[in-house]
Structures are given as structure tokens and as C-alpha cells.
């Protein structure tokens, strides 16, 4: 019975308005125009949501910290940052000093919203002064991809 309903014209009339693309008044009836919003929808977090503090690890050996950051750069929870940060780390992390590694750790673990990192790295939003470091400048340069390297998957481990 469900199959009959799904393939009936009544179900198509119900679903069509939900999936119909936007048609602009200037376009002809046979031409469909898909639009994207001109502004980023970004709301501040409500004050009643506690943001947990990331635990500092002052006694962590440098190699262990780099291994942890390699893992955390690959497993962000959003594909855009997974690709940007994993390729950035594959290219630069082994050459980072202890201070640069600490800056990168603060950048990816001190920010509570991964979209902020993405917007700062792509220069869609201005970077706050506390995160406008040498590492952020390197990340922005990496994101520009002046070498035109394909980044459609994460680098091998």
C-alpha cells in the first residue's frame, strides 16, 4: 500500500513543492535557476550552552602531540575541514617547532566551532586576533592552493 502511494500522482503533488528549485521571474519557464544565499547564516551560541574547556597537556612529548594533532586534523566531523587540515598537516606538521605545534593545537582545539576555522581559513570572515598567528597565515596560504593541487581525498598515513 505504501508503494502504491509513493508512486501515485497524489504523493507527487505533495512532495513536488518541497523539492522544486527556485525559479526566477526573469528566467523562461523551461530554464531552472538554482541560487545560493548571498550571506552566511551564522548565529551566536546561546549563553546557556556551556562550552567545555579543552584540557591543556603541558607535559605531552612533542612527537606524541604531533601524532594526536595528525589524528585530530583528519577527524574533524566536517569534510571541508578534514580535507583542508589533513592536507595542511601532511605538508607542514613534521617541520613545526614546539611553539608552532602549540599554536596549531590551540587553533584546532581552542575554537568551539569548526565552521569558524573554515571561514577564517577561506577568509570569508576576519580572523580574531588571538588566532591570527603564523600558523593561521600558513593555513590561509595553503587554502589558496596556488599550486592547484587536487584535494579530493585525505593524504595517506
UniProtKB/Swiss-Prot annotation:
Main location: mitochondrion
Cell compartments where the protein resides: Mitochondrion matrix
GO CC, one annotated term: mitochondrion
Keywords annotated in UniProt: Chaperone, Mitochondrion, Transit peptide
InterPro entries: SDH, SDH_sf, SDHAF2
Span of the signal peptide: none
Cysteine pairings via disulfide bonds: none
Superkingdom, taxonomy of origin: Eukaryota
Keyword Glycoprotein found: no
Entry keyword annotation includes Metal-binding: no
Pfam family, one: Sdh5
Family: Belongs to the SDHAF2 family.
Function: Plays an essential role in the assembly of succinate dehydrogenase (SDH), an enzyme complex (also referred to as respiratory complex II) that is a component of both the tricarboxylic acid (TCA) cycle and the mitochondrial electron transport chain, and which couples the oxidation of succinate to fumarate with the reduction of ubiquinone (coenzyme Q) to ubiquinol. Required for flavinylation (covalent attachment of FAD) of the flavoprotein subunit of the SDH catalytic dimer.
Assembly: Interacts with the flavoprotein subunit within the SDH catalytic dimer.
Protein's name in the database: Succinate dehydrogenase assembly factor 2-A, mitochondrial
Species for this entry: Drosophila pseudoobscura pseudoobscura (Fruit fly)
UniProt lineage: Eukaryota, Metazoa, Ecdysozoa, Arthropoda, Hexapoda
